[in-house]
């Protein structure tokens, strides 16, 4: 893969190199829901299963659909390299409530909360239809709300409120409490970004 000085391609190339040296058995010991058949890892992201070849990287969707964009593929590589299987204790956290949340809150607000508000709060019906198409669980909160499984054991909720003449649209994203120790803060930002992009792709 020829790499240009690009904000998406350079991180991907970095993790692709690390991925080549990955020990599959070590991955299985950390991520028991991930499968390995001697040639490919199989893992689930937002209800879809993907096969990732190792050591020479290649990705395919088991449903025959499109493969995810490069930032999502980078996230999956980081998950295979560093992911942890941590039990969810049944609590929900905002991004700000988790470690380092205050430090990352400005980029998070722009990339996730504001984007979700104006993408979904202005098209609530489309948001509901796309979320249900993805198999999300409907929630009784907000003008519309759904719960998703990002990767096994890690859940996210998006709640949206429609705007009106007086108030702009609004959104909140909640994370299962195991994100606190299971993902670095920058990966929590990316997780929100991936969730919004995936829902929007199902409009």
Predicted feature locations:
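Amphipathic, interaction-prone secondary-structure segments
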Residues: 27-55, 137-162
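Ampiphathic alpha-helical segments that act as solvent-exposed interaction surfaces
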Residues: 67-89, 176-203
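Charge-rich alpha-helical segments
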Residues: 1-18, 38, 56, 65, ...
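Domain-length accessory/inserted modules outside core catalytic folds
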Residues: 104-108, 112, 116, 141-142, ...
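Short, charged/polar micro-motifs that form catalytic or ligand-binding hotspots
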Residues: 62, 66, 117, 144, ...
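Conserved binding-pocket/active-site segment within a compact domain
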Residues: 122-181
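Intrinsically disordered, low-complexity regulatory segments enriched in Ser/Thr/Pro
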Residues: 48-74, 161-186
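Short Lys/Arg-enriched alpha/beta "domain-start" segment
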Residues: 1-39, 72, 79-134
């Amino acid at each position: 893969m020829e790499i240009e000085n690009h904000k998406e391609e350079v991180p991907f190339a970095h993790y692709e190199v690390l991925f080549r040296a990955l020990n599959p058995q070590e991955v299985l010991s950390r991520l028991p829901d991930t499968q390995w058949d001697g040639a490919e890892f199989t893992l689930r992201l937002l209800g879809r299963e993907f096969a990732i070849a190792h050591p020479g990287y290649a990705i395919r969707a088991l449903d025959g659909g499109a493969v995810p964009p490069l930032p999502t593929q980078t996230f999956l590589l980081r998950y295979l390299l560093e992911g942890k299987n941590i039990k969810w204790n049944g609590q929900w956290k905002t991004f700000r409530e988790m470690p380092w949340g205050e430090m990352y809150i400005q980029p998070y607000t722009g990339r996730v909360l504001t984007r979700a508000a104006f993408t979904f709060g202005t098209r609530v019906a489309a948001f509901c239809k796309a979320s249900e198409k993805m198999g999300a669980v409907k929630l009784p909160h907000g003008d519309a709300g759904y719960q998703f499984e990002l990767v096994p054991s890690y859940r996210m909720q998006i709640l949206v409120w429609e705007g009106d003449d007086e108030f702009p649209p609004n959104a909140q994203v909640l994370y299962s409490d195991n994100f606190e120790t299971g993902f670095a803060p920058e990966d929590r930002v990316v997780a929100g970004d991936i969730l919004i992009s995936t829902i929007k792709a199902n409009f």
